[in-house]
Amino acid sequence: MVRVMVVIRIFGTGCPKCNQTYENVKKAVEELGIDAEIVKVTDVNEIAEWVFVTPGVAFDDVIVFEGKIPSVEEIKEELKSYLEGK
């Protein structure tokens, strides 16, 4: 199996919802055992370029969640689907 690297961006200003989203993404990546770079985007101007409501999550340049805390299972499902299409 070819390992595909994915950059996962978490958009948020450090609020509890954004921090929980980060933890859920981290856990999903660990459970799937995938190669991922997880980046916290906290600059308000950069966040505004990507999402209207935080927290937000993007895989590479694709927004997959916005304005909610995705569960670990939701993240895993989206990641698997995304990586199958790469």
From Swiss-Prot:
Pfam families: Thioredoxin_3 (PF13192). InterPro entries: Thioredoxin-like_fold (IPR012336), Thioredoxin-like_sf (IPR036249), THIRX-like_proc (IPR005243). Transmembrane segments: none annotated. GO terms for molecular function: protein-disulfide reductase activity. Disulfide bonds join C15-C18. The active site is at C15 (nucleophile), C18 (nucleophile). Keywords: Disulfide bond, Electron transport, Redox-active center, Transport. Belongs to the glutaredoxin family. Does not function as a glutathione-disulfide oxidoreductase in the presence of glutathione and glutathione reductase. Has low thioredoxin activity in vitro. PANTHER family: THIOREDOXIN. This is Thioredoxin. It comes from Methanocaldococcus jannaschii (strain ATCC 43067 / DSM 2661 / JAL-1 / JCM 10045 / NBRC 100440). The lineage of its organism: Archaea, Methanobacteriati, Methanobacteriota, Methanomada group, Methanococci.
